[in-house]
Amino acid sequence: MKIYLVGGAVRDALLGLPVKDRDWVVVGSTPQEMLDAGYQQVGRDFPVFLHPQTHEEYALARTERKSGSGYTGFTCYAAPDVTLEDDLKRRDLTINALAQDDNGEIIDPYNGLGDLQNRLLRHVSPAFGEDPLRVLRVARFAARYAHLGFRIADETLTLMREMTHAGELEHLTPERVWKETENALTTRNPQVFFQVLRDCGALRVLFPEIDALFGVPAPARWHPEIDTGIHTLMTLSMAAMLSPQVDVRFTTLCHDLGKGLTPPELWPRHHGHGPAGVKLVEQLCQRLRVPNEIRDLARLVAEFHDLIHTFPMLNPKTIVKLFDSIDAWRKPQRVEQLALTSEADVRGRTGFESADYPQGRWLREAWEVAQSVPTKAVVEAGFKGVEIREELTRRRIAAVASWKEQRCPKPE
């Protein structure tokens, strides 16, 4: 029996990055031998075991053979005669097909070290094309390591295009697509994930609402980048700088979906694109089984982001009504999320990356003023039933009006 550290732990250690999870491959052993040594079997489809002390995963070396469609149609073979090289060959990328023995020596049968040095994401073998999930995984790796200068090898991108055009991605379940997307949204450069999907044709298949934005022009005065698809990825990049929250990043990505519905004869203007985009947000989120909380926020951001841009022109009644509309009294975090997504929208434009966004500050200040109006005082004043809400709203409007007079500049 020989045991090797494999995959991501080896890769990230060589890149000088923190190692989160360690996975091991066991060569020359059997399930019974692992059980006798105290390991606990957890793999149903192939033999994976948990170490009795560390609880890290130890998998018997195995090969995989395509036996059906999609990413689940594989038959696994695990036996003592499967070599380390056999096991590593089934992996997606050369940089993930590295192993380390107990002496610290790196085993590299597929030039993963060379690709690490050259910052290349390259597939190990043609078997890559048998698993459509790998298209998303490579896009996610491209986003995860973009800050280190990694790019996808030409032949790998070509294979990803071929897989997409062959309809392989249609076998992916919504849950898997969302999971990979969610993971990509946590990276430093999530916009790279969607750009890679567009480069290989997968964006049109998996995110048609976003793909439809490319080639749709916006007024150059407000959008020097002109192309709405480019603007969308720029706003996502900015959102990633402003917040680590997947909620903020995903909803920023969806903020302008309505512009994809504008008839070409009305370009480059997109009047009413915010409310128009709400149905597209719902459609996308329902298809991918996006969590309800994120879906609801995305709907609100699509509908109201342009309203925040005009904050100085809003009257106090409209501001308080906005807080009602986003259910801020029960979900106060939405105020901050709306401020961040609106800021990402403004700064996600060519030449505006460092722009100030005072509307976000004013939104936050107005919220602090409105929520500080005490409900208890209204009740103690003798109001009952529906009168309590009406009087509370009146007092909130009055408080915001007083604040706005002192703190918020009057529109020109």
Curated annotation (Swiss-Prot):
Residues 228-329 form the HD domain. CTP binds at residues 8, 11, 91, 137, 140. Mg(2+) binds at residues 21, 23. Gene3D superfamilies: Beta Polymerase, domain 2 (3.30.460.10), cca-adding enzyme, domain 2 (1.10.3090.10). It catalyses: a tRNA precursor + 2 CTP + ATP = a tRNA with a 3' CCA end + 3 diphosphate; a tRNA with a 3' CCA end + 2 CTP + ATP = a tRNA with a 3' CCACCA end + 3 diphosphate. Magnesium is required for nucleotidyltransferase activity. ATP binds at residues 8, 11, 91, 137, 140. Keywords: ATP-binding, Hydrolase, Magnesium, Metal-binding, Multifunctional enzyme, Nickel, Nucleotide-binding, Nucleotidyltransferase, RNA repair, RNA-binding, Transferase, tRNA processing. The keyword Transferase applies. It comes from the Bacteria. GO terms for biological process: RNA repair; tRNA 3'-terminal CCA addition. Its cofactor is Mg(2+); Ni(2+). Comprises two domains: an N-terminal domain containing the nucleotidyltransferase activity and a C-terminal HD domain associated with both phosphodiesterase and phosphatase activities. A single active site specifically recognizes both ATP and CTP and is responsible for their addition. NCBIfam families: PRK10885.1. Monomer. Can also form homodimers and oligomers. Catalyzes the addition and repair of the essential 3'-terminal CCA sequence in tRNAs without using a nucleic acid template. Adds these three nucleotides in the order of C, C, and A to the tRNA nucleotide-73, using CTP and ATP as substrates and producing inorganic pyrophosphate. tRNA 3'-terminal CCA addition is required both for tRNA processing and repair. Also involved in tRNA surveillance by mediating tandem CCA addition to generate a CCACCA at the 3' terminus of unstable tRNAs. While stable tRNAs receive only 3'-terminal CCA, unstable tRNAs are marked with CCACCA and rapidly degraded. Belongs to the tRNA nucleotidyltransferase/poly(A) polymerase family. Bacterial CCA-adding enzyme type 1 subfamily. This is Multifunctional CCA protein. It comes from Escherichia coli O157:H7.
